[in-house]
A protein has these predicted regions:
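Glycine/Thr-rich phosphate-binding loops of Rossmann-like dinucleotide-binding domains
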Residues: 129-130, 279-280, 338
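Cofactor-binding loop segments of dinucleotide-utilizing enzymes, especially the Rossmann-like FAD-
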Residues: 8, 174, 200-202, 333
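Short, intrinsically disordered, charge-balanced linker/junction segments flanking boundaries
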Residues: 1-8
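Glycine-rich dinucleotide-binding loop and its adjacent helix/turn
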Residues: 56, 123-191, 197, 293-301, ...
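Feature captures the FAD/FMN-dependent oxidoreductase FAD-binding
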Residues: 46-128, 239, 246-259, 265-268
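A Rossmann-like FAD-binding core segment of flavoenzymes
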Residues: 81, 85, 187-291, 356, ...
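Glycine-rich active-site loop/strand segments that organize a redox cofactor
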Residues: 11-62, 139-140, 147-148, 152-159, ...
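C-terminal, flexible cofactor-proximal segment of oxidoreductases
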Residues: 272, 276, 293-435
Length: 435
């Protein structure tokens, strides 16, 4: 089965590289795909300590980068290949006769066009963060404050230290990205006098963010919430709850966030409100999306954060990921839409199932199995208060980034910002004048 991997970044796992300083909740034993391990073992690769928690940088350096350099993958990955659109040759979304026989057309940002018999969309959600506005659209004035708003997971104690030291920061959001940033800011505040922290959330009760504590089967994840709770109770973090941002503006050199008659001011705002999938690039394909989560309709009840935590999501694969457009599948974090209940191991099994189906091994494709650490920390239990989008796309470890294919089986999911295109017919590549 011929294939090509399209990576938008200049190197493997470009999105993870932006938060390489962050430690994952899941130890290595949950982070390495079995098919990827088989390929790496052929190169003399030394497996990391399976009980250790890797950082994003270690995930790249010890796993994803070596994987991308294996003989089976090295010549299959195209870097700097940002996907602009996916459609079918000669067909928009409306036209039907002969549709299934037409190849997919994948157009890159530089005008290059690639034909494919199937497309696995593992683009993730990192490039499409949610907005600060409390109604799902940007707050009034938000777009004009780019220089004062930073995206999730800044390197507070490292390369971004000067931006936060001795200044007031407002962290907006109630997910694990927000918790991680708040803890780093708390450490910075202990080192640098004058460092102030406000935590701005839409909900009324933060038990969901504080999580399972000692009951969490991923101890690092449970400890994260427990430490954050201590920071809030000590007064080092000012918790501003029930705050739905309506507008944002610059006043006397600081950002002013407004919710009704209430105001929050800060030198810098960290947008930790989560992420959402970008379906615009596949707008001409026929998708069956759940109207609430933005996942496939069949997958939605299995991952609903009102009913499930990360570890209680049942095994699922090609059947739940299929769309009315035969041959197109979204896997990984993108497949979950706005649900924050995603784990790396889930994406690995999704991708394995889809690749097995494309190879014609439907028995293997439907033999889906998952062994996940269970906890309530990723649920949106309504007893905890408002179930908003603040945690969307931000659950329980990183979006999957490794790609690995063996004959008929095995694919660790996702090249961030790119698209994995599986081709089982001769490849035709067309270039525009920009190519």
């Amino acid at each position: 089965m011929d294939f090509v991997v399209l990576e938008a970044g200049s190197a493997v796992a470009a999105a993870i590289d932006e938060w390489r300083h962050v430690k994952l909740f899941s130890p290595w034993r949950y982070d390495i795909d079995s098919a990827a391990r088989r390929l790496l073992e052929q190169t003399g690769w030394v497996e990391p300590d399976l009980g250790k928690l890797p950082t994003g940088g270690e995930l790249i350096d010890a796993y994803l980068a070596p994987l991308a350099k294996t003989p089976q993958l090295n010549d299959r990955i195209r870097y700097g290949a940002q996907v602009a659109a996916v459609t079918r040759v000669g067909f928009d979304r409306i036209r039907t006769p002969g549709r299934e026989q037409a190849p997919f057309l994948v157009r890159l940002a530089d005008g290059t066009e690639i034909l494919a018999s199937a497309v696995i969309d593992a683009a993730g959600t990192w490039r499409k963060p949610n907005v600060l506005g409390g109604s799902g659209i940007p707050a009034r004035g938000e777009a004009e404050l780019d220089g004062h708003i930073t995206r999730a997971l800044p390197d507070v104690l490292g390369r971004d230290r000067e931006r936060f030291a001795g200044r007031r920061t407002a962290v907006v959001g109630a997910g694990h990205s927000a918790a991680t940033t708040l803890l780093d800011l708390g450490e910075l505040a202990a080192q640098v006098p004058g460092t102030e922290i406000a935590w701005v959330v839409r909900g009324t009760d933060q038990a969901r963010t504080y999580g399972g504590g000692e009951a969490d089967e991923l101890p690092a994840r449970g400890a994260l919430g427990s430490r954050l709770k201590q920071l809030v109770q000590s007064g080092r973090v000012e918790l501003v709850s029930s705050f739905r941002i309506e507008s944002a503006s610059l006043k006397n050199g600081q950002v002013e966030l407004v919710a009704g008659e209430r105001r929050v001011t800060a030198d810098t705002v960290v947008n930790s409100t989560g992420f959402r999938p970008d379906h615009d690039i596949v707008a001409e394909l026929r998708l069956d999306l759940d109207p609430i989560l933005g996942s496939t309709r069949a997958l939605a009840p299995l991952i609903d954060p009102n009913q499930h935590s990360c570890g209680t999501v049942p095994p699922h694969g090609v059947d739940e990921l299929a769309h009315p457009e035969p041959g197109y599948y979204a896997v990984g974090a993108k497949s979950y839409g706005r649900a924050p209940t995603f784990l790396l191991a889930t994406g690995y099994e999704q991708a394995r199932s889809v690749v097995a189906a494309l190879a014609g091994d439907w028995a293997a494709a439907r033999d889906v199995q998952l062994d996940l650490p269970e906890t309530g920390v990723c649920s949106s239990n309504l007893a905890y208060g408002d179930s908003s989008d603040e945690t969307a796309g931000g659950c329980c470890g990183s979006a999957p980034q490794a790609v690995e294919v063996t004959t008929g089986r095995g694919l660790a999911t996702g090249i961030s910002g790119g698209l994995l295109t599986v081709i089982d017919q001769p490849t035709t590549t067309q270039s525009s004048c920009c190519g």
